[in-house]
């Protein structure tokens, strides 16, 4: 994967000035990342990924940043999601009392990343930044899942990601904060 990042960096560098000048999302960079399989960097091998840990991720991110720092930063958001999901081992999930459905969802999202899906982090809110203690986005359990209400004010890659890691506070118990991987599509609006 390091070799892929080194190969891509000059391509990213050649496009970086135009993306910055136009204030545009680096669409071609992300197409290259997808084609190179880098969205599966931190996905376990058993789920089709490269199984990289943090040190290998940092080496790859360094090479990507040599080409375009903005692309590397947005890629970092994706890696933080896949790295966190990969860190929830079956043993940890069992110790936390997570239901089997949570593990199935974890594996499905990680397999999707290994196949080219990428995820952004939607955390920041007006007046709260990314401080979870001041967040107002809330969720409640509904038949078949959860309903999340709220607005995030900043998200690197908004409008381009396949899913968003969204932090929300329980409407029933405001002291409880959970994170949801929300797929792009109906019910999610990016402005």
Give residue ranges: language-model regions.
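A short, acidic/glycine-rich surface segment
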Residues: 132, 190-191
């Amino acid at each position: 994967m390091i070799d892929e990042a080194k190969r891509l960096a000059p391509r990213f560098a050649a496009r970086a000035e135009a993306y910055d000048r136009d204030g545009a999302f680096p669409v071609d960079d992300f197409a290259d990342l997808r084609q190179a399989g880098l969205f599966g960097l931190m996905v376990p091998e058993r789920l089709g990924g490269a199984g990289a840990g943090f040190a290998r991720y940092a080496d790859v991110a360094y090479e990507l940043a040599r080409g375009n720092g903005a692309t590397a930063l947005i890629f970092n958001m994706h890696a933080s999601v896949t790295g966190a999901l990969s860190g929830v081992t079956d043993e940890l999930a069992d110790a936390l009392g997570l239901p089997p459905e949570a593990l199935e969802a974890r594996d499905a999202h990680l397999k999707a990343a290994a196949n080219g899906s990428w995820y952004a982090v939607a955390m920041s809110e007006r007046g709260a930044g990314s401080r979870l203690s001041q967040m107002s986005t809330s969720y409640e359990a509904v038949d078949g899942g959860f309903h999340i209400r709220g607005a995030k004010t900043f998200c690197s890659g908004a409008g381009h990601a396949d899913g968003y890691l969204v932090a929300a506070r329980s409407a029933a118990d405001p002291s409880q904060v959970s994170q949801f991987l929300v797929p792009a599509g109906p019910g999610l609006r990016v402005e």
